[in-house]
C-alpha cells in the first residue's frame, strides 16, 4: 500500500496504491494502463525513488527503491514535468527555457557515451545547436529523452513522455527501446494513453483500476482478450483492451472526475 500523508490533523491518509505487487524479469517491456487518477504516475514515482515508503517493501533490482541511491546510476525516470523546474546543470535559479545550448547541457554525461549520444541525436532528430528558449514543446521533449537515455539503464520508467512527439520519432523511439530490452536485458515500464503502434510492443501488461489496485497483470500471452482480438484480426488490440476495461469501470462505478491522485471527485451516472 502507499498513501500520501494527510495535510490536516485527524484527516485520514489518502490511500493511492492498494495491495500492489509487480514483478518483472530483466528484458521485460511492461505497458501500464489505467484511467486518469488511477495511480500510474504515483506508482512510477515510487519505483523511481521519489516517494518514501514504509519499511523496505518496494524493491528495484533487489534493493530499496528510495534509500539505495546507487540505483540512480542504472535507473532512469522520465515524466512530463521536465522543463518546468529549475535544474542544477543549468545553474541556480535558471529554468530550461533560458538561452542554453543543447550540446552544452549535461556535457560531461554526454561525453561519457559518445556513440550512444550520437545514436540518440540521430534517432530523435535533435540538433546540438538548438537553444532551449527557441524550441517547441515536441523538440524540448526530444532533448529530455536524449539526456535521460544517454546513460545506459537497467530499468526505465516512462510516464506519458511521448505525448508531444510526432509519429515518426515516437515509432523510432519505441523500436529503439525494444532493442534495448532485447540486446541489453533492460526493463521498461511505460505508462501511456496512446496505443497506436503498441500492439506487438509490450511483453507484459499491468492494469490499475480506480481503487489503485491491480485489475490485471501478466505476460501478454496469458491475456485471453488479447489472443481473441489477434485471432479476429482486430486493427488495434491494445486500444480495444484499454477501452473495454475502462468502460467496464465506468459502467460499474460511474464517470471518473476524481481518481487516486486526487484530481477532483467521482461522479455517478445515476
Predicted regions and their residues:
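A short, flexible loop at the N-terminus of ABC-type nucleotide-binding domains that lies
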Residues: 2-31
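The feature captures the beta-strand-to-loop junction immediately N-terminal to the Walker
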Residues: 33-35
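H-loop/switch region of ABC-family ATPase nucleotide-binding domains
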Residues: 191-193
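Conserved beta-strand-loop-alpha-helix hinge in the C-terminal portion
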Residues: 212-250
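Hydrophobic anchor residue at the start of the ABC signature
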Residues: 145
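Helical segment within the ABC ATPase nucleotide-binding domain
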Residues: 170-184
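Walker B catalytic motif
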Residues: 160-161
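ABC ATPase nucleotide-binding domain signature region
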Residues: 29, 44-108
